[in-house]
């Protein structure tokens, strides 16, 4: 793994649904991926993972050891439902408790990075108070993460509050904590009116991982690779030239497809071809 120039992973929701992590990691290995990113979204099923028993957590660790496929990151999108910026104190408290549990879970199973959704609120109307509560919630969250040595990394979103690296850097400077970094999504970044290459260069010292997907203006999910607006080769070239050596994660939602593995293999080959054109050579 450490000899590979490009650590390449796949999002959990790209693979067949289910709770057997040994099978999921075995499939990811068969498909040639180095790691899988876990999803803890707003559904009760995936939220319940944060209450796994010691035995369930150990089963995940054992699956990682057995397959050699890591689970180094978690996409924590549960805060759509329980936002840190909520003006309802009970909802906000639930959001902070989810954060605490996620950090503890990460510490237990070896997850290094928790990707955060940059929403002050999602299903409610945002205002100055929701943004203030969100900032305060992030500050409290980063304090918890610091004690656990777990990195919280902000995603560049499909939402105006956090739709550029420049905006996310504002939060990084505000929090001024090494355990808060950035996890850009080049699809989301490209779907807005951003100077994508400048944005990537500006954030390079704070980027801990990169989501890879295609998008169109106003369409942030399920755009087939090559049918959107993302200039993948330029993005990969910029990241390479800027000195980025971290992981790339192909983000897809093909878990309910007729043949998820075939969809993933097709996307993997497409992305790797663009990486090769950008001069990113895989080590054998």
Swiss-Prot record:
Pathway: Cofactor degradation; L-ascorbate degradation; D-xylulose 5-phosphate from L-ascorbate: step 3/4
Organism domain of life: Bacteria
Keywords: Isomerase
Catalytic activities: L-ribulose 5-phosphate = L-xylulose 5-phosphate
GO molecular function list: intramolecular oxidoreductase activity, interconverting aldoses and ketoses; L-ribulose-5-phosphate 3-epimerase activity
UniProt enzyme class: isomerase
Stimuli inducing this protein: Induced by L-ascorbate. Repressed by UlaR.
Family matches, as Gene3D superfamilies: Divalent-metal-dependent TIM barrel enzymes (3.20.20.150)
EC number per UniProt: 5.1.3.22
Gene Ontology BP, a term: L-ascorbic acid catabolic process
Keyword Ribonucleoprotein: no
The keyword Isomerase appears for this protein: yes
Chain's role: Catalyzes the isomerization of L-xylulose-5-phosphate to L-ribulose-5-phosphate. Is involved in the anaerobic L-ascorbate utilization.
Record PANTHER family: ISOMERASE, L-RIBULOSE-5-PHOSPHATE 3-EPIMERASE ULAE
Family: Belongs to the L-ribulose-5-phosphate 3-epimerase family.
Name assigned to this protein: L-ribulose-5-phosphate 3-epimerase UlaE
Organism in which the protein naturally occurs: Escherichia coli (strain SMS-3-5 / SECEC)
Phylogenetic lineage: Bacteria, Pseudomonadati, Pseudomonadota, Gammaproteobacteria, Enterobacterales
């Amino acid at each position: 793994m450490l000899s590979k120039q490009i650590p390449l992973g796949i999002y959990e929701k790209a693979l067949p649904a289910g709770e057997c992590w040994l099978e999921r990691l075995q499939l990811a290995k068969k498909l040639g991926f180095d790691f899988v990113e876990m999803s803890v979204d707003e559904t009760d099923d995936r939220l319940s993972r944060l209450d796994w028993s010691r035995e369930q957590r150990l089963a995940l660790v054992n699956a990682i050891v057995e397959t050699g496929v890591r689970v180094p990151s978690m996409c924590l999108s549960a805060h759509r439902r329980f936002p840190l910026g909520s003006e309802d104190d009970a909802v906000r408290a639930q959001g902070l408790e989810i954060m605490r549990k996620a950090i503890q879970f990460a510490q237990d199973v070896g997850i290094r990075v928790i990707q955060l959704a940059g929403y002050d609120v999602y299903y409610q109307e945002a205002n100055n108070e929701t943004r203030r509560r969100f900032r305060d919630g992030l500050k409290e969250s980063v304090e918890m993460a610091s004690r656990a040595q777990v990195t919280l990394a902000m995603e560049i979103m499909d939402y105006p509050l956090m739709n550029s690296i420049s905006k996310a850097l504002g939060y990084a400077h505000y929090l001024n904590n090494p355990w808060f970094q950035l996890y850009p999504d080049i699809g989301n970044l490209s779907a807005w009116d951003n100077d994508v290459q400048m944005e990537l260069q500006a954030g390079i010292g704070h980027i801990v991982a990169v989501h890879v997907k295609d998008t169109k203006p106003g369409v942030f999910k399920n755009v087939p690779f090559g049918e959107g607006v993302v200039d993948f080769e330029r993005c990969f070239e910029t990241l390479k030239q800027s000195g980025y050596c971290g992981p790339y994660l192909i983000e897809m939602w093909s878990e309910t497809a007729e043949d998820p593995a075939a969809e993933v293999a097709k996307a993997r080959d497409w992305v790797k071809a663009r990486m090769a054109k950008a001069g990113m050579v895989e080590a054998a």
